[in-house]
Amino acid sequence: MVNDCISDLLTRIRNANLVKKEKLIIPNTRVSRNICALLEKEGFIDSCQVNSTEELALQLKYKGRERKPCITNLRRISKPGLRIYASYKNIPKILNGMGVVFVSTSQGLMTDREARYRKLGGEIVCSVW
């Protein structure tokens, strides 16, 4: 049993990218589905499908002949031992807006751009670039 499903998800994606795997199976949780949906919407992965009540299947995305991963770095910001919260004015920009920060708000999980547009603050979950 994993205590932190977000860190587990990010680590599995990072490790699969390092060995250039096409598909990845992860545990099916609501948070995992939301993060994968945002990764798909932002263009970091090809697809996310529900295999069963316990599994999600991710199709990872690579660029060019060298098959460079679309995800350069995944970083967990708010951890179970140290939660990080920010108002919409203080949500950090990653690589001057080239990267994406996922924010857990009262309206659900969303990207930093969407949270700033809706003027919602919340917990800074992770960053992707």
UniProtKB/Swiss-Prot annotation:
Gene3D superfamilies: 3.30.1370.30, 3.30.1490.10. GO terms for biological process: translation. It is found in: Plastid, Chloroplast. InterPro entries: Ribosomal_uS8 (IPR000630), Ribosomal_uS8_sf (IPR035987). Its main location: plastid. The keyword Ribosomal protein applies. The keyword Ribosomal protein applies. GO terms for molecular function: rRNA binding; structural constituent of ribosome. Pfam families: Ribosomal_S8. Keywords: Chloroplast, Plastid, Ribonucleoprotein, Ribosomal protein, RNA-binding, rRNA-binding. Belongs to the universal ribosomal protein uS8 family. One of the primary rRNA binding proteins, it binds directly to 16S rRNA central domain where it helps coordinate assembly of the platform of the 30S subunit. This is Small ribosomal subunit protein uS8c. It comes from Oltmannsiellopsis viridis (Marine flagellate). The gene is rps8.
